Amino acid sequence: MIDSIKFSDEFNKAFKKLKKRYKSLPNDFLSLLHELKENPIQGVALKNGMRKVRISFASKNRGKSGGVRVIIRLTVSETCLSFLYIYDKQDMSNVAETFLDQLIVEMDNNSNKIN
């Protein structure tokens, strides 16, 4: 059961940019958030407890394959869900592992927490 959620600064910046381009993103993201709270083990497993989850959204009129990717991380205890980064597959096919590792370090040092 997820009891806390964190957002990296990079996630917040990228989300804000994507929100300008895709008006349905906030609602589509809320749907994903509810799904992840129920079952956080979704998407493709990456290293260090990270996962890449696909979102389809109404603004693009496409399925998940052409949509947005969200990189999340579960803590060892699996009670905290961290949103590391969000990107449009159209703009970027993958995110560098070194960039994701840097985001993990920054998130571990900062506490940008909501409950």
Where on the chain are the PLM-derived regions?
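Arg/Lys-rich, positively charged N-terminal/basic patches that mediate binding to nucleic acids
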Residues: M1-S31
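Enriched for short, Lys/Arg-rich terminal
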Residues: I2, V68, R73-N115
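Non-catalytic, surface-exposed connector residues within folded enzymatic/regulatory domains
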Residues: I5, K23-P26, V44-K47, S65, ...
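Short, structured surface patches at the beginning of a domain
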Residues: S24, D28, V44-L46, A58-K60, ...
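Negatively charged, low-complexity tracts enriched in Asp/Glu with abundant Ser/Thr
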Residues: D28, L32-K37, Q42
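Basic/aromatic recognition patch in beta-strand/loop cores that engages polyanionic ligands
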Residues: I41-I86
